[in-house]
Curated annotation (Swiss-Prot):
Cofactor note: Binds 1 zinc ion per subunit.
Record flagged with keyword S-adenosyl-L-methionine: no
One example GO MF annotation: ATP binding
Gene name linked to the record: alaS
Species: Shewanella sp. (strain W3-18-1)
Role summary: Catalyzes the attachment of alanine to tRNA(Ala) in a two-step reaction: alanine is first activated by ATP to form Ala-AMP and then transferred to the acceptor end of tRNA(Ala). Also edits incorrectly charged Ser-tRNA(Ala) and Gly-tRNA(Ala) via its editing domain.
NCBIfam families: alaS (TIGR00344)
Superkingdom of the organism of origin: Bacteria
PANTHER family xrefs: ALANINE--TRNA LIGASE, CYTOPLASMIC, ALANYL-TRNA SYNTHETASE
Record's protein name: Alanine--tRNA ligase
Annotated family: Belongs to the class-II aminoacyl-tRNA synthetase family.
């Protein structure tokens, strides 16, 4: 009997393979063919274009075990995860599909056969639902399968509109749609709940295990349902639900996969109560987080990366709640790989990257979590009602980086309501402020709407004849311009490359008899290319012919930098891992900037390896091959496509040997050897999960190396050596400096001890307490604490205030012996003095430090100390 989740997965795929279905691998959690989807959330996602007739496959029957995530957007189960028996951020959807092949009868028979014959589920435990008017499905269930009429439940339009029903599926307001039939399993009368369609249907007794969608109509914009020429079938069965049934448990969190993950999480954190809901949350979240990272998503502050970050942080918060004191989440990855079996193949290949990414995010959040929980606890302790206001929730999010859903989680556990409307209002107000600020210095040319087209000839030509088809000044269309006028010119054809894909627009000239227009930038305006610049000489009107001349030197240098970004991208993926994807770039004649996804600083050894890899490919002098092809063909060849970019059906593919292949519309060198030299000048983080490399090529790289050599020679001269001995001599100087600093510190301690002996005599007695207040000249701030400790030991029961002024700054220290902290607290004392010298400070009751910016007030401030102390000792 099939019982483990892995066995059920294999049995399902084998069943449909034996019935003529092509077994298709699970697609990525990042949809490659649907920009409207945040994550893959159903088995049919990867076949959407097939169902729409836009993609042809060499099979008409398919079966999959699809990885899915529902956390963010329309399908968001995050808030319920861990608190119910069946909500998950990650799940596997088993499915079988027919693309114009079999239809209702075969689909129903396949489902019933697998459940009752292969898995041997008792038929009396099963009931089915159909759409209210789907008599064909009723006949198949009743006559062909033998399900009693009372166990076939018709579901009508129960969502408030025609065809808005649990049993009618629609891709959108228009397009493919059709009725569906669902199979439910009865867990038994010991669990509350009623049959589907009954008032108690929300209970957990009857659980949907299989949904079969019959795509048989095309919904017209008028609402008319037109029959599809080739009806199709889309089915789905959640593996976690069927595993619970086969393993004799009611909750999905009791199946083998979750039992193993919960046990491991409990072991790592050190808890024994395996029924704790926080363990459920952690066990669920490691699945979605690990597989998302494996599919190329990195924690960030936007889009998919932000959802991933929220899930990781929710898991970490629940670990913290259980008592976790160090990073634990990433340690679950090996167990996850073990329990997921064949479904974890891609995860196993990226295990090291996944663990590093999760650990880095967890450690980064630990600091935010501790601070945020403290502030939230304080806010909740002061709450008089049962609602936490939106302003406080927003402040936690905006100032301290504490996600709203985590605030809601904590409040939920304490039966506190979160003012979500107030939070959203505060968010909207912030967006308005940001937009208002962002309007300053806006490029009003970007608002130009140009109804024209410009042909581009700049891949092969840098000079060409063209006709002026439009002229714009200050956003308005004009017919002519004169010398000195700034304008945007549109040509019918141009060799000028318009800014796109990170490559800056070309510069150059448009010339004719007595006419010279300097092009300072080139931008796209829809299908038109705008040449922005100034008319230096002559007059120019629409319809005139000009010679368009691109600045060859600038274009050449830009091409070097653009081509090398492709080599850099490929090298980063080789050295750091395939999770690296381009997040942005800037390519101009002077340098290149390349932003990419990565969870930590790139190590110097890794940077060196990347640089060496790129320069090796440059020396190999690969010919750059450019070809146009269908986007599907390009992807099959392994061409890198950028997430978020929209591509036409025909794309331009740039290949450099066997090292790099990318979709790209930019301009490039003829051979990699033209680049000459590649030199990285900096690497750093620009956002969480996003790194930036800046580099130079060609002559700029040679100049950079020459500058470094000159600086090295200058350093060698200062150290009185040659360039080969700089490191050794510098190390010797640093060692010498450390010894001098050590000697100086010892000398300062001796001086402080001597000074303390002299200062003891300056103490005055107030109500039996030694009080010493002193301004010290020539004493460094770092020596104050040691001096204060020495004085405390000598004076025994004492209150001490010392101050020093150096380079326009005041440093203060207050010390109170332990027997006196009940009457005088050092923190309050030093804060009083600091306030009078333009500063602030604080500390423990027995010792506190402060600073200030008004040394001219130090004497007067210290004069206030004795009366202040006397009052408190009275």
């Amino acid at each position: 009997m099939y019982q483990t989740t892995a066995e059920l997965r294999s049995a399902f795929l084998e069943f449909f393979r034996s019935h003529g279905h092509q077994v298709v691998d699970s697609s990525s959690l990042v949809p490659g063919n649907d920009p409207t989807l945040l994550f893959t959330n159903a088995g049919m996602n990867q076949f959407k274009d097939v169902f729409l007739g836009m993609d042809k496959r060499n099979y008409t029957r398919a079966t999959t075990a699809q990885r899915c995530v529902r956390a963010g957007g329309k399908h968001n189960d995050l808030d319920n995860v861990g608190y119910t028996a069946r909500h998950h951020t990650f799940f596997e959807m088993l499915g079988n599909f027919s693309f114009g092949d079999y239809f209702k009868e075969e689909a129903i028979c396949f489902g019933w056969s697998f459940l009752t014959e292969t898995l041997k589920l008792p038929k009396e435990r099963l009931c089915v639902t159909i759409y209210q008017t789907d008599d064909e499905a009723f006949e198949i269930w009743n006559k062909k399968i033998g399900v009693a009429a009372e166990n076939i439940i018709r579901i009508g339009d129960n969502k408030g509109a025609p065809y808005a029903s649990d049993n009618f599926w629609q891709m959108g307001d228009t397009g493919p749609c059709g009725p569906c039939t669902e199979i439910f399993y009865d867990h038994g009368d010991h669990i509350w709940g009623g049959r589907p369609g009954s008032p108690e249907e929300d209970g957990d007794r009857f659980i949907e295990i299989w949904n079969i969608v019959f795509m048989q109509y095309n919904r017209h914009i008028s609402g008319e349902m037109l029959p599809l020429p080739k009806p199709s079938v889309d089915t789905g069965m959640g593996i976690e639900r069927i595993a619970a049934i086969m393993q004799g448990v009611h909750s999905n969190y009791e199946i083998d996969i979750f039992r193993a993950l919960i046990a491991k999480a409990a072991e790592i954190i050190g808890v024994t109560d395996l029924s704790n809901k926080s363990l459920r949350v952690i066990a669920d979240h490691i699945r979605s987080c690990a597989f998302l990272v494996a599919d190329g998503v990195m924690p960030s502050n936007e889009g998919r990366g932000y959802v991933l970050r929220r899930i990781i942080r929710r898991a970490v918060r629940h670990g913290n709640k259980l008592g976790a004191t160090e990073a634990f989440f990433y340690k679950l990855v090996p167990t996850l790989i073990d329990v997921m079996g064949d479904a974890a193949k891609g995860l196993a290949e990226t295990q090291v990257i996944v663990e590093k990414a999760l650990k880095a995010e967890e450690e980064q959040f630990a600091r935010t979590l501790e601070r945020g929980l403290g502030i939230l606890d304080a806010a909740l302790s002061e709450l008089t009602g049962d609602t936490l206001d939106g302003e406080t929730v927003f402040k936690l999010y905006d100032t301290y980086g504490f996600p709203m859903d985590l605030t809601a989680d904590v409040c939920r556990e304490r039966n506190i309501i979160v003012d979500e409307a107030g939070f959203e209002a505060a968010m909207a107000e912030q967006r308005s402020r940001a937009q208002a600020a962002g309007n300053f210095g806006a490029d009003y040319n970007a608002a130009l709407k140009i109804d024209a087209e410009t042909a581009f000839c700049g891949y092969t030509e840098l000079v060409g004849q063209a006709k002026v088809t439009a002229i714009y000044q200050n956003g308005e269309s004009v017919t002519a311009i004169k010398a000195g006028d700034e304008a945007v010119l549109v040509l019918d054809v141009t060799p000028f490359y318009a800014e796109s894909g990170g490559q800056v627009g070309d510069k150059g000239q448009l010339v004719a008899n007595g006419i010279e227009f300097t092009v300072n930038d080139t931008q796209k305006y829809g299908q038109a290319t705008g040449h922005q610049g100034v008319l230096v000489a002559g007059s120019l009107s629409i319809g005139q012919m000009v010679e368009a001349k691109v600045d060859k030197k600038l274009r050449h240098r830009t091409q070097l930098n653009h081509s090398v970004t492709h080599l850099l991208h490929a090298a980063l993926r080789q050295v750091l891992g395939t999770h690296v994807t381009q997040k942005g770039s800037l390519v101009d004649p002077e340098r290149l900037r390349f932003d990419f996804s990565h969870f930590e600083a790139v190590k110097p050894a890794e940077l060196k390896k990347v640089e060496e890899l790129v320069n090796t490919q440059i020396r190999r002098n690969h010919e750059l091959k450019v070809a146009e092809m269908a986007i599907d063909e390009a992807k099959e060849k392994g061409a890198m496509a950028l997430f978020g970019e929209k591509y036409d059906a025909q794309v331009r593919v740039v290949t450099m040997g066997d090292f790099s292949i990318e979709l790209c519309g930019g301009t490039h060198v003829g051979r990699t050897g033209d680049i000459g030299l590649f030199k990285i000048t900096s690497e750093g983080g620009i956002a969480a999960g996003v790194r930036r490399i800046e580099a130079v090529t060609g002559a700029a790289a040679m100049a950079y190396v020459a500058q470094q050599q000159a600086e090295l020679e200058e350093a060698a001269a200062l150290l009185k050596g040659d360039t080969h001995s700089v490191v050794a001599k510098l190390k010797a100087q640093l060692d010498k400096m450390k010894q001098l600093e050590k000697d100086m510190a010892q000398l300062k301690d001796k001086l402080a001890a001597a000074a303390s002996a002299d200062l003891v005599g300056d103490a005055v007695v107030v109500n039996g307490v030694n009080v010493l207040i002193k301004k010290l000249d020539g004493v460094e701030a770092g020596s104050l604490r040691g001096l204060q400790d020495e004085l405390k030991q000598k004076l025994k029961s004492a209150i001490i205030v010392l101050g020093t002024a150096q380079e326009g700054k005041v440093n203060l220290i207050a010390g109170v012996s332990n027997d006196l902290v009940g009457k005088v607290k050092a923190g309050e004392l030093v804060a009083m003095v600091a306030a009078q010298v333009g500063g602030k400070g604080g500390g423990r009751p027995d010792m506190a430090q402060a600073g200030g910016s008004q040394p001219e007030n130090l004497d007067a401030a210290l004069a206030q100390v004795l009366p202040w102390i006397t009052e408190r000792l009275a």
